[in-house]
Amino acid sequence: MREEFKLKPISREAIPRAIQKAERYRLINQSWAAESICRDILEIDPTNQQVVVMFVLALTDQLVDTHAHAMKTVHETLPRITDPYHRAYYTGITFERSGQALLQRGGMGSGAMAYDAFREAMGWYERAEAIRPSGNDDAILRWNTCARLISGSSHLAPQAENAYEPALDD
């Protein structure tokens, strides 16, 4: 049996320091700790856009290990990003990182699933590009990265029309 705890709330005054800690934990590859801090901040300030974005990034940092659970939470969180450009851009980041996680995990069909994720990311980057602020070409840089990944790997290709289907006994 798992032990349950009543979590302790942080004070509103502690939010700036907590944000700095979350950023540091992401930098040292302890995204699970950054995720936890973001959850604490969002309990107090649920519309804090910097923290909503950091929460999405902390979750997507962990996709190799927790793909299904993290993706569900990410997709529930992305609509909380209020700026249309940032929402499109970070949705693209989410799909790109999902594709990278699929490639790292490998397995049957992972190349085609990763291809689909990268193509979905590219679509979101194109949406972001269309509404980007002047001088911000981040979406173009990410789109180009996905294009180079797909072009440079024979493992990344769409699912074959005549994909393998196991024979069934009559």
Regions found by a protein language model. Give the residues of each.
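Repeat-mediated protein-protein interaction surfaces in helical alpha-solenoids
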Residues: 1-9, 32-38, 68-76
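Terminal, low-structured helical/coil segments at or just beyond the last alpha-helical repeat
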Residues: 2-5, 130, 134-170
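TPR-adjacent "capping" and linker segments in tetratricopeptide-repeat scaffold/adaptor proteins
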Residues: 2-17, 78-80, 112
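Conserved structural position within tetratricopeptide repeats
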Residues: 9, 42-43, 76-83, 130, ...
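Amphipathic alpha-helical repeat scaffolds of TPR domains
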Residues: 12-17, 45-59, 82-106, 137-149
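Alpha-helical segment of the N-proximal tetratricopeptide repeat
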Residues: 13-37, 107-109
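Glycine- and aromatic-enriched membrane insertion/assembly motifs of diderm outer-membrane
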Residues: 32-33, 39, 43-51
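Short coil/linker segments at helix-helix boundaries
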Residues: 59-83, 90-127, 152-166
